[in-house]
Amino acid sequence: MSRRPARAPFAFGGVEVAAGRRHELSLPISQLVTGADVTLPVHVLHGREDGPTVWVSAAIHGDEVAGVEIVRRVLERLQPTQLRGTLLAVPIVNVLGVMAGDRYLPDRRDLNRSFPGSARGSLASRIAHLMMTEVIGRCTVGIDLHTGADRRSNLPQIRCDLEDPQTRALAEAFGAPVLFHARLRDGSLRAAARETGARVLLYEAGEAWRFDEYAIAPGVDGVLRVLAALDMVDPADVGLTEPGPDAVVDAPGPLPGEVPEERTTDVPEATDATGEDTEAVHPDVVDGEQDSPYLVWQSTWVRARADGLVHLDVSLGERVSAGDRIGALYNSFGRRLAHVKAELTGVVIGRTEAPLVHRGDALVHIGGWDT
């Protein structure tokens, strides 16, 4: 009986990683003013058998640390000897932002608006170029991990092109409560990666600067489910005891269930609605049972109509109807200034966690079904 020939090593960063092995590399980015090197950390897991090449990245914004923990836990559960294909994991893309405790780079550029970048451009452009040439350009599928901004929390959700059948199948495999059809933004990692032909899932969950278990645990399982859907791992080998959802409900109108008694529904005012745990349970997340993810085709932020203190009556994952009273704004004397009302029928996919707001501040992000 002839032996199967050994899989060729994977050349990366000047190193050849043998089949069935893992290697940690640091790709040079720049230097600090002290002369200390700044490098991009990359884990290479080169499977013993052939399969796709996939990347997972986190902390493209320096305050989005939950993704770093997701990558750590995913790597704990993966063995390259059981892997088919190759995984490139980048736990921190915006190294300088993380070092400085800042969402952005020292030059105040948003790294996620700097792709595909240039080898001779700004610092942001150079980091983007390094990611594109060394990581993204070698992969057919990618998962980019994000959280909400400072003092904003997000319901776990996948943002992607739901009109592409292959991308949608991977999004369904991930198993997040919300699948959000999101347009591509110029300069984003996702847009640049799509130009290479790669399918990309963007996972949004939790809040900046926090290890929210309700965001991390589903993210870990979701990444592993995608690898299983690509036949890169066997579910039992990576601790997946339950498969992801096998059906997606594309709701044409309000979701089943009654409006909670304490909430009042008004006739909608004339507004522009187009504007814009391990039991992983956030204290606010998901009102009632939910068997399948929500498909979200549009969204709107409800904004503050006055300056003051906001009290919100809706939680992440809660269903609302246009016109519902979902909170109120008060002044410092405790007098109510305005009701906060839903401008769209759908599900709460994000909300502010800041009690002090100014007129025009984003309060509640609602995802809706209508295209």
Please place each PLM-identified region on the residue numbering.
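Structured catalytic-domain cores with a bias toward divalent-metal coordination
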Residues: 1-371
